[in-house]
């Protein structure tokens, strides 16, 4: 009865959005079929990239507190929400205010707490794959019900094109003058794009650390399958990606890994270099050094117009630091995108573990990041976000 009721609501709703969380990754085949039959735009969480191919017209990319132009558009304008294996957290639903026009929710989840998070919910509790297969079999044979949904899907597709155009513009920035470095250096979005393209070319797994690298990372990646990227957005443990490289030396079927980390996150656990060499890991750690906690700096700038105590005056030569560990191949990247490409090639050909030190820009130049498109219940935004939350239907 709940399955049939869910299908009826999906077929009759003109603007359906699916929030695909980390719990949907193992069931991406069922999800792709379900999205087609539901006529739904699909919004990803930071940890679920790849459940839809990057160029799939239904893939609106990430949506949440950081989000994207297309992902947050779909969240803000949908009237029916289908949650699949997702938790209601800031980077997923904008601290509870990400769906202002949604009237009803269908929640497919294995966790009862997540299943019942929203009001006005039909809860489908159990194995996500089994539930999706049953729903897929329950849709009408005729596709006439999809016709009224086309205007919605076209509007979402227009926003996807807008997002991709914006990414291309920001990621092609050659260099911005940085006061700390005293010269033009790559922006983080431009540098991360180069590394992600390299990883895709060599079918390497990407591991993203917490902070600014993480945020720019999940907005950048162009995954076509789950497992191409792992990003620790659940708790944002600094040092996660560096430690993850160790797994290459311990896995039965190792795959080349590339850890993308900031200077602060790397320093949380440089001991991982020793463990990686000890276990024979083969991979690469790319340190994007902006001499500060840039994620917090940008949040302070947005809320107060000034950053406070998020940087230091101590320069660290991370290539020298890493090269002190025997078995580590360390590189300093001097220059722009071409130099980064060249160094990535050299590091990839090295046997064992490689570490790249990449200096990147930090500051208020709008090209330094990929933007924030949602709400966040933090700092001096709390009162307004909570007022909105209490007024929501769901």
Language-model regions: role of each:
Residues 157-252:
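Active-site diphosphate/adenylate-binding microenvironment
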Residues 33-39, 93-112, 226, 368-385:
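A short, gly/pro- and small-residue-rich
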Residues 22-24, 48-49, 86-89, 111-113, ...:
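Short glycine-rich anion-binding loops that position phosphate/pyrophosphate groups of nucleotides
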Residues 65, 72, 77, 115-116, ...:
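Thiamine diphosphate
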Residues 1-9, 175-178, 381:
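Conformationally flexible catalytic loops at phosphate/diphosphate-handling active centers
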């Amino acid at each position: 009865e709940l399955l049939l009721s869910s299908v009826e609501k999906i077929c009759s709703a003109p603007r359906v959005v699916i929030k695909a969380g980390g719990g949907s990754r193992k069931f991406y085949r069922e999800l792709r079929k379900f999205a087609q039959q539901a006529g739904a735009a699909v919004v990803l969480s930071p940890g679920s990239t790849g459940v839809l191919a990057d160029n799939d017209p239904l893939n609106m990319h990430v949506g949440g507190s950081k989000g994207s132009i297309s992902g947050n558009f779909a969240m803000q304008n949908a009237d029916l929400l289908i949650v699949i294996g997702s938790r209601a957290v800031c980077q997923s639903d904008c601290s509870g205010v990400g769906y202002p026009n949604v009237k009803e929710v269908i929640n497919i989840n294995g966790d009862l707490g997540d299943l019942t998070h929203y009001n006005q919910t039909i809860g489908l509790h159990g194995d996500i794959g089994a539930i999706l297969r049953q729903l897929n079999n329950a849709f009408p044979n005729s596709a006439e019900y999809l016709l009224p949904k086309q205007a919605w899907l076209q509007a979402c597709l227009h926003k996807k094109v807008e997002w991709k155009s914006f990414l291309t513009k920001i990621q092609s920035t050659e260099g911005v003058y940085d006061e700390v470095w005293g010269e033009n250096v790559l922006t983080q979005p431009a540098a991360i794009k180069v590394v992600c393209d390299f990883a895709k070319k060599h079918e390497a797994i990407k591991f993203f650390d917490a902070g600014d690298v993480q945020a720019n990372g999940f907005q950048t990646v162009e995954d076509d399958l789950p497992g191409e990227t792992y990003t620790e957005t659940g708790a944002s443990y600094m040092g996660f990606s560096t430690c993850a490289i160790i797994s290459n030396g311990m896995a039965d079927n190792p795959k080349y890994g590339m850890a993308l980390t900031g200077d602060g996150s790397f320093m949380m656990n440089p001991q991982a270099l020793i463990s990686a060499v000890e276990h024979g890991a083969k991979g690469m750690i790319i340190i994007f050094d902006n001499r500060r906690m840039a994620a917090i700096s940008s949040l302070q700038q947005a809320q107060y117009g000034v950053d406070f105590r998020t940087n230091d005056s101590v320069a660290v030569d991370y290539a020298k630091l890493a090269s002190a560990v025997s078995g580590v191949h360390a590189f300093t990247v001097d220059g722009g995108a071409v130099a980064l490409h060249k160094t990535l090639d050299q590091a990839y050909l090295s046997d064992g573990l490689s570490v790249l030190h990449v200096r990147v820009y930090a500051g208020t130049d709008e090209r330094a990041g990929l933007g924030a498109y949602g709400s966040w219940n933090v700092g001096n935004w709390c009162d307004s976000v909570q007022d909105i939350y209490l007024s929501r239907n769901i």
